[in-house]
């Protein structure tokens, strides 16, 4: 490629499952999973906050399920690796507070008529606007900067849990800067410019050992060699010390990592968080169907890059607006693609829940609560399934 091409730098970050905000996301979604597993009609809005030696779950839940909230909190913390005060939280001995009430009857009658409505009549649980995004720069049709930052975070956890790097502790953050060029609206990654990893560690390890292990066991297996060169910059634990972490280091709250959960700063975001919300909450289900729409457009070859916006009013099933922009990469005009999207996707919340099988609990939502909701290769991530679009391909 000619060196004269104008390039730019774009950065995405991620945090791994031991970050206090992500711990809260996972607890909120573990509660949602437990409710849906017993009662698929559960209405859940579960928030979590944490600080040293304390976790609190609070919100509105209406369910027939019999759920032991404290047990779920402790189990989720334990599974992440918070098993002693040294690492930032002791799952078995921390204080757990629960303040959960029923969903407001005013909201209930407006959204689902106290469970009397058919799925296609269920109204949106709130107002709001959501975005879905897709780009052809990676096989998962996600931005490379975001994919790499996310995979580095997941790999950090993997080498901690499998004993490869026994000095690791649960909390950690990653950030990747990619050099791109703009090919008529499509994003083409050229190289990785900077890799930043800050990970919690124990007292026994030196900064040199940390840097060597991170390069060998985390960066090398994750970032394809073709993107690294002698100019790539590495910042590995640049603060010099990160022993205190998890809720001991920082307070955590559900819904504070919404860009990490989505597209790493690419596309756009309507502001609504995902975790702890059942599918009548369009913050979540709307964003999931918008991703499926955008991904299906790019996968069908209709565009190289695409964003879809939808918006809702509380109690109203049909979206108020649907918007599509292909950044000039569309094979046909955007207004034609918009028509295809409207014919191919049912954006009513009750139908999204059925078509994407969103009423299923288990560990379904817990899995989404760390390492991103999109671009994941897992059958439970039903919104990642490419949907055949209803359109007449122009004859060659």
Curated annotation (Swiss-Prot):
One protein family per Pfam: S-AdoMet_synt_M
Cellular compartment(s): Cytoplasm
Reactions this protein catalyses: L-methionine + ATP + H2O = S-adenosyl-L-methionine + phosphate + diphosphate
Residues that bind Mg(2+): 13
Tissues expressed in: Expressed in roots, stems and leaves (at protein level).
Gene Ontology MF, one: methionine adenosyltransferase activity
Binding positions (L-methionine): 60, 103, 250, 281
Nucleotide-binding is among the record's keywords: yes
Record-linked InterPro entries: ADOMET_SYNTHASE_CS, S-AdoMet_synt_C, S-AdoMet_synt_central, S-AdoMet_synt_N, S-AdoMet_synthetase, S-AdoMet_synthetase_sfam
GO annotation, cellular component aspect: cytoplasm
Signal sequence range: none
Keywords: ATP-binding, Cobalt, Cytoplasm, Magnesium, Metal-binding, Nucleotide-binding, One-carbon metabolism, Potassium, Transferase
Known pathway: Amino-acid biosynthesis; S-adenosyl-L-methionine biosynthesis; S-adenosyl-L-methionine from L-methionine: step 1/1
Cofactor info, note text: Binds 2 divalent ions per subunit. The metal ions interact primarily with the substrate. Can utilize magnesium, manganese or cobalt (in vitro). Binds 1 potassium ion per subunit. The potassium ion interacts primarily with the substrate.
EC id: 2.5.1.6
GO BP terms: one-carbon metabolic process; S-adenosylmethionine biosynthetic process
Binding-site positions, K(+): 47
Residues annotated to bind ATP: 19, 171-173, 239-242, 250, 256-257, 273, 277, 281
UniProt entry tagged with the keyword Chaperone: no
Induction: By salt stress, in stems and leaves (at protein level). Follow a circadian regulation with higher levels in the light.
Family listed: Belongs to the AdoMet synthase family.
Function statement: Catalyzes the formation of S-adenosylmethionine from methionine and ATP. The reaction comprises two steps that are both catalyzed by the same enzyme: formation of S-adenosylmethionine (AdoMet) and triphosphate, and subsequent hydrolysis of the triphosphate. May be involved in the synthesis of betain in response to abiotic stress such as high salinity.
Quaternary structure and partners: Homotetramer.
Protein name as it appears in the record: S-adenosylmethionine synthase 3
Gene from which this protein is expressed: SAMS3
């Amino acid at each position: 490629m000619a060196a004269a091409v104008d390039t730019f730098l774009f950065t995405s970050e991620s945090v791994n499952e031991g970050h206090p905000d992500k711990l809260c996301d996972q607890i909120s979604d573990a509660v949602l999973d437990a409710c849906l597993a017993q009662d698929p009609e559960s209405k859940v809005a579960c928030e979590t906050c944490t600080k040293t030696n304390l976790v609190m779950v609070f919100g509105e839940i209406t369910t027939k399920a019999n759920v032991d909230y404290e047990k779920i909190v402790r189990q989720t913390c334990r599974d992440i690796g918070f098993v002693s005060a040294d690492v930032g939280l002791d799952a078995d001995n921390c204080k757990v507070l629960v303040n959960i009430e029923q969903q407001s009857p005013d909201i209930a009658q407006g959204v689902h008529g106290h469970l009397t409505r058919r799925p296609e009549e269920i109204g949106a649980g709130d107002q709001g606007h959501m975005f879905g995004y897709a780009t052809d720069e990676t096989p998962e049709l996600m931005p490379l900067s975001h994919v790499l930052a996310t995979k580095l975070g997941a790999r950090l956890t993997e080498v901690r849990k499998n004993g490869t790097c026994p000095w690791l502790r649960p909390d950690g953050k990653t950030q990747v800067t990619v050099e791109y060029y703009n090919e008529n609206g499509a994003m083409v990654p050229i190289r990785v410019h900077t890799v930043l990893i800050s990970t919690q560690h124990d007292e026994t390890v030196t900064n040199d050992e940390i840097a060597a292990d991170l390069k060998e066991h985390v960066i090398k297996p994750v970032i394809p060699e073709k993107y690294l060169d002698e100019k790539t910059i590495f910042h590995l634990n640049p603060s010099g010390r990160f022993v205190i972490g998890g809720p001991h280091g920082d307070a955590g709250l559900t819904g504070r990592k919404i860009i990490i959960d989505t597209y790493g700063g690419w596309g756009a975001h309507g502001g609504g968080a995902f975790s702890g919300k059942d599918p009548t909450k369009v913050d979540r289900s709307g964003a999931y169907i918008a991703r499926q729409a955008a991904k299906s457009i790019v996968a069908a070859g209709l565009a190289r890059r695409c964003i879809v916006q939808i918006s809702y009013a509380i109690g109203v099933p049909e979206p108020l607006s649907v918007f599509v922009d292909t950044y000039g990469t569309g094979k046909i005009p955007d207004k034609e693609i918009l028509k295809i999207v409207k014919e191919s996707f049912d954006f009513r919340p009750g139908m999204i829940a059925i078509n994407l099988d969103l009423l299923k609990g288990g560990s379904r939502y817990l899995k989404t609560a760390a390492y991103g909701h999109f671009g994941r290769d897992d059958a439970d991530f039903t919104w990642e399934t490419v949907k055949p679009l209803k359109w007449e391909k122009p004859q060659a």
